[in-house]
Amino acid sequence: MAPGRVYPPSDKPIALLDLLHFHLVHNPYFPIYIFPNDDDTLTEISFLEFTRAVHRVAHIVRPNRSGQDGEIVALIANTDTLLYHAIGAGMILADIVPFYMSPRNSTPAVASMLQKTACNRIFTIPSVHESLISGLDGLGGPALQFQTIPTLAQVFPNLGKEKSHYPFEPYPEAAITPALDAVFLYLHSSGSTGYPKPIPLTNRCQLHWLQQPGILGYRHYLPDLCLGFAALPPFHSLGNCMQLYTPLISVITVALYAPTSFHDPTAPPVIPTSENILDNLRKTGANCIIVVPSFLEQWAWDEKAVETLKNMSLVLYGGGPLSSKVGDALCAAGVSLAVQYGTTEFGAPTQLPDKVQLENGLWEWMRFGLSVLIRWVHQGDETYECQLLTTEKYQMAVENMSDVKGYATSDLFVKHPTHEGLWKIIGRTDDVLTLASGEKTVPAMMEGIISSSAHVNGVIMFGRGRNQVGVLVEPRSAHVDLADNKAIEEFRNRIWYEVDEANKNAPTFSRIFKEMILITSPDKPMFRVGKGTTSKNATLKAYEEEIDALYRTVEASTKIGNSTAPPSEWTVSTLEHWLNEQATELALGTIVVPNIDLFAQGFDSLSATFLRNRIIGAMRSFPDLQLRAAARRIPHNLVFECPNIKLLADRVAKIAGQPQSQVNEQVKGSALHDAKMEIETMLGKYSAELRRTKKTNGSHVESSASTKAGRTVVLLTGSTGGLGSYLLASLLKNEEVAKVYALNRHSKASRVQQRQTAVFEDRELDVALLKLDKLIFIEADATAERCGLNEQTYDQLRQSVTVIIHSAWRVDFNLPLSSFEPNVRGTFQLVDLALSSTLHSTPRFLFISSVGSAQGWDRSRGAFPEDVQLDASVAVGSGYGASKYIAERLVTSSGLNATSLRLGQIAGGPNGAWTLSDWFPILVKSSLALGKFPNIQAYVSWMPAEKVSAAILDVALAKHAPPPALNIVHPHPVSWPDVLKPVRDAVVAKKRLPKESLPFVRMSEWVALLEMRAEEATESDINAIPAIKLLDWFRALAGVDEDLQRTGRTDVEVGGIVKMVTEKAQSISATLSGLSQIGQADAKLWVDYWIARGLF
């Protein structure tokens, strides 16, 4: 394929631009890049062609070297790798300092980096990054210049066919050589602890990094390598080093994806997938690859993929840990696997693996280059922190040490016991446990509380990368017989008080369940160092198998409760007592009231799962075969279906096979057994309280949206939610609004300002708005009397608020009505606040309701009107919709100028932001895994989030009092296929799938596939197909679809919601009346957002 080559000198540093000139003279037709064509041929990009492309870029971005040297210019462009590197090198040739920025960064993150580097100019693709550009323009600050990047056709006019005799004009040479410590390139950190930080690379760094073993080492590696590095992002330090530096210094070819932008400069580049990475390797003949571990985890169990990897000379990974199970399996299959280590802060200091490493399966171990000076800081056990020191031949990009120049990595390594010079990374000095959800648990405080037990000698929490944490406990005096389940249970009970105390001081995701307490073995005590402190890494390594086994038990949910002491008998009275004990323990020690909803007493889905599993484990511990068989009849949603102890005891007793369930007569005849009666009972309870409140507060005149001074003061609940964030941004930008009180619940995990900022960044809203003086955050408990506020704050609200927008509400379609009583109570408290206003007129009260409040409407009666319905049967169905109906009735009867806004499905915002946990993104992700999309005979009246927000504000700030009820749904709905087909097409295009992929099937067929995958589903199955968790919801959708198929009706919303009348709403809201239909552009935004957030 390639002609002979001449290597640049390796005995002295040589700069990137000098390397280009060297190859232009010595290796003009050696291919720096190759990519496959549609006809299975290859296109080669020679050093001659690439160097000329770099010069063409320089001519375009800075003609005749006009202007000032050293200008910092950001490069934000989602384009082909070939073009990206040519532009970056061309900018350097033109004495421009490029700042490579990931196009996935949020607008505030980009703004932060621009400000920190005094960068006011951006090279980009305006039509592709329109939302980013408009967002940056909207932030104010220094004026920014946006310049379109050169196109592939401009830079490579003879793509793959450039010859030396073709016309070409070199770019003028620089008058002076840049200083060694001048910055030649900016990269940035990942932003895992805040906004990404700019990282400057000087010319000295460039010279030294080109000589690093992780780059120069490819030069003489045997066998000769062709590098399949197409999947690396070019703006990342790894992509920059591997795709540009390595071929330049090692004279080696890199295989890329075929560029897509030659004929259409706005076309997106190929998105790497597990399939197209391997396909590109096969087509280009590349024999070396470097990828992130997630791809290897996908390939490890695919025979065809493993066969491809076996034929590679080197399979390298970096960027994160690879599980031992996967790595060992690949090595056992004959894959030449090895790890590479490096970061933007210090480059690529490790060597490529040698023959000994590959032949002995030492894939986790690495060897640092001889030129790399490391200070290994012993941690008191077998681990060492790696600290890289600056030398005359190795300059760090970042230096963070006080006593010497260098970079402390915080990475912990261990030495290989027999192979001198080999090291393995095993963790961080910062032992914060990052869960699979991304939530972070700080163990120190919880470990300290548990250690205070007289029965405990040592405590180490674990759970990094898992769904929940656990704790390893060493008993103080007598050892526990680990073969005796009763002894284990007794010890757990002895230390439970301290564990419970630790849980009370921790966020919900950090709490430790009794089943997650692992006890040390007498023959494997905890490792200790220094003054007797535990050595965490060494101990956790020793208990690796036991910890893995514990998580496997958790994953196999039907086995988890086996260590729970069962009830003495399976009667209702005994079960009530036993279940109450279990529930109290799972609710963090809160004494559970038997006839009150568990989810109103601190339960969540994880607690419900553990309680169900304890029931199953208790049944299976009995010798009675009939009782053991009954364990298989425990439904998945048992606790959701029976959400208090009395109902649960009755249901379990029936399943256990008791001849006559001893059901309390009051419960049997209560409203909980009659859905309509249940709604009316809860409504009656709070209506009675409301009547007493109205008598106490007296009368007011009809309200308007503003005070006498004409200024509006708004109390907004739920501002940190999806819709709430758009409402808050709109209110803060509105000049009519003088002040906004954002009332949100308290959270142990973070302050409300932090949560609000994170939501704004995710939705690319203007974070600067959150610094306005007109915004006041309030953390409160709306369910408590006076909303749990102190007298001063409460009075301040009574004396100033003119509009209340109540948006906060729990969203969970699995829960029964009783679980939403705290939300109903919170609505009552807010109504009470409004009625106690000291203003001349009471505040205008807007309740954000849902079309779900009409879920029981008889379709034969036509469309659902914009009126308050007094017949509770219209709301019979899910607890969510029923609770919204009750709140509607409460605010209507309050005497306030109150309006209930029944919202339909809220779609993604301007940047496509659509919460990943919502049912529709879950359907899309699951469809990708199932290989089919469901078709439904119904329509959708979805509205983009920012339009919903605007419509609500139209009503909130209307001059005249709006009516009691309005339906805020899209007045021009579209059919399900008109939405889902563009979504499916966008997924196929973004994932580079064959056009015939992901066919449509009937909803019932799709649900049947889902049910098959749900049987014996593991944690990994549920991660890939999250629709399993909403199986009942999707079954209901399929049931409605079958009814519609039989009747031929098409005038029903997806999910069975009837058509909603919107005439009144349209007359008040110009936003609603002027709304365009959703379509292909919206679908593309949603899919782009989901992919950027890692949904699939």
Swiss-Prot record:
Domain Carrier: 569-656
E.C. number(s) listed in UniProt: 1.2.1.-
Organism for this UniProt entry: Serpula lacrymans var. lacrymans (strain S7.9)
Description of its domains: Contains three distinct domains: an adenylation (A) domain that activates the substrate amino acid which is subsequently covalently linked as a thioester (aminoacyl-S-PCP) to the 4'-phosphopantetheine prosthetic group of the second domain, the peptidyl carrier protein (PCP) domain, as well as a reductase (R) domain of the short-chain dehydrogenase/reductase (SDR) type.
Region (Adenylation (A) domain): 39-352
Chain positions with O-(pantetheine 4'-phosphoryl)serine modification: S605
Lineage: Eukaryota, Fungi, Dikarya, Basidiomycota, Agaricomycotina
Functional summary from the UniProt entry: Adenylate-forming reductase, a natural product biosynthesis enzyme that resembles non-ribosomal peptide synthetases, yet serves to modify one substrate, rather than to condense two or more building blocks. The A-domain preferentially accepts L-threonine as substrate. The natural product of the enzyme is not yet known.
GO molecular function terms attached to this record: ATP binding; oxidoreductase activity
Family: Belongs to the adenylate-forming reductase family.
Record protein name field: Adenylate-forming reductase Nps9
Cross-referenced PROSITE patterns: AMP_BINDING (PS00455), CARRIER (PS50075)
Renumbered residue ranges of the record's region Reductase (R) domain: 716-952
Binding site for NADP(+): T720, G721, G722, L723, S807, A808, W809, Y880, K884
Keywords attached to this entry: ATP-binding, NADP, Nucleotide-binding, Oxidoreductase, Phosphopantetheine, Phosphoprotein
Amino-acid biosynthesis listed as a keyword: no
Keyword match Ribosomal protein: no
Positions that bind AMP: H236, V339, Q340, T344, I425, I426, G427, R428
